[in-house]
Amino acid sequence: MSLWINGEWRPGRGPGFSKQDPVNLKVVWQGEAADAGQVAEAVAAARQAFPSWARLPFAARQAIVEKFAALLEASKAELTAVIGAETGKPRWEAAGEVTAMINKVAISVKAYHVRTGEQHSDLPDGAATLRHRPHGVLAVFGPYNFPGHLPNGHIVPALLAGNTVVFKPSELTPRSGEAVVKLWQQAGLPAGVLNLVQGGRETGEALSGQADIDGLLFTGSSTTGFHLHRQLAGQPQKILALEMGGNNPLIVDDPRDVDAVVHLTIQSAFITAGQRCTCARRLLVRRGEAGDAFLSRLVTVSQRLIPAAWDAEPQPFLGGLISEQAAQKVHQAWLQRVAAGAVTLLEPRLLQAGTSLLTPGIVDMSDVANVEDEEVFGPLLGVWRYDTFEEAIALANATRFGLSCGLISPEREKFDRLLLEARAGIVNWNKPLTGAASTAPFGGTGASGNHRPGAWYAADYCAWPMASLESPTLTLPASLSPGLDFLAGEAS
């Protein structure tokens, strides 16, 4: 039973597909995709459930969402294993993802009240009130790199606001999506409030093309995000929240504590096998002996990063990529850069045929002309050398993306300048690019997206504001506008 529609598990009528553990190649899920008719049924179920769900007191919706958080806590070990086996990420990282899902609930409840609750202002003759109302039926598209945490950042605030949801996980992580929905089912969500449709591109296009959805919340690649934007063009009545990729720069201007800088760089570039949208893709290093020493140390430490299975002991820093195809694609990107004139500082190696185990790669791109401005979603780091800080900022901004940017330097003045000139939604100073706080916005500008998903700021796009001028009584004003004449005794 692949799909959950209107409170019932049912098989899909679309093509069958399966997902393997990308390292040991064991099948972890198999089922069928939803066909277009079943997608329409899921949207219809969400539409039917919307009025009663939206009318529930907020406290009642909150209670169900908090029950979901409690079930996450109780099922943490099991869900960690599901996410780890399906994505290839190490146990410690999969467990951290589940913890982030749990923490998201309390933050989302607070964000609802602070950002989208009711606000009242007294007026001389009444009051002004700001309220927020749910959009209706929202489609949520989940990515594969954080198959629990990132969709959760859309679904939790959407449900708290009173929306109903049709959720399509990535076709590369169907088991994680199913496991999370089963916890929502146990939490007591009414039938139709949350629906699950599995499948790939055809299922996704059927969902985004549904006339009866009121919006679409997406986290994933820029290629897919741009396609969705085109598909929904001319429909301003629908909310479209896109959080996409990045070609993110990390500027190493003054690496004084070399090992600390190397550690930060590895955390920025290679965590999650480079499969975070905020990962550093471009390392900008000042020319000179200090930069040379830093790069030498970075290569030395990075070549010790040997990926292994999600449940390997001792636990590795890196697991596998999401699939063998993903690992091959990153390896091909390295070969293309070498063919274009890049100098390999650390060669990425495919460790075992048929698996997704890929070691990190580092290539010096300083002398390569006409570099394609695309996100390589994996552990491949390009290096560019520069002479002046002005040149570094220009290199950092030489991208159509605008997700994250970082500076390693003891000089606050340089960070202040970067804050003014960087074109990115996240700008960090002596902190990894991959670090994020749930109370801060997460997202970018340009080709990186148009909204800020996750907890605090997700509340903004999960409800629309309603303004009211209110008075319990109505009396004729003592002073009338020019041209109005109400003579006493004329009214009958």
UniProtKB/Swiss-Prot annotation:
GO MF annotation terms: succinylglutamate-semialdehyde dehydrogenase activity
Positions with a binding annotation for NAD(+): 220-225
GO biological process: arginine catabolic process to glutamate; arginine catabolic process to succinate
UniProt KW keywords: Arginine metabolism, NAD, Oxidoreductase
Signal peptide from the UniProt entry: none
CDD domains, A to Z: ALDH_SGSD_AstD (cd07095)
EC code(s) of this entry: 1.2.1.71
Source organism, top-level taxon: Bacteria
Active site, renumbered: 243, 277
Catalytic activity: N-succinyl-L-glutamate 5-semialdehyde + NAD(+) + H2O = N-succinyl-L-glutamate + NADH + 2 H(+)
Protein's pathway: Amino-acid degradation; L-arginine degradation via AST pathway; L-glutamate and succinate from L-arginine: step 4/5
UniProt function note: Catalyzes the NAD-dependent reduction of succinylglutamate semialdehyde into succinylglutamate.
Alphabetical list of NCBIfam families matching this protein: arg_catab_astD (TIGR03240), PRK09457.1 (NF006992)
UniProt cross-references to HAMAP family, sorted A to Z: Aldedh_AstD
Family, as annotated: Belongs to the aldehyde dehydrogenase family. AstD subfamily.
Protein name: N-succinylglutamate 5-semialdehyde dehydrogenase
The species this protein was found in: Klebsiella pneumoniae subsp. pneumoniae (strain ATCC 700721 / MGH 78578)
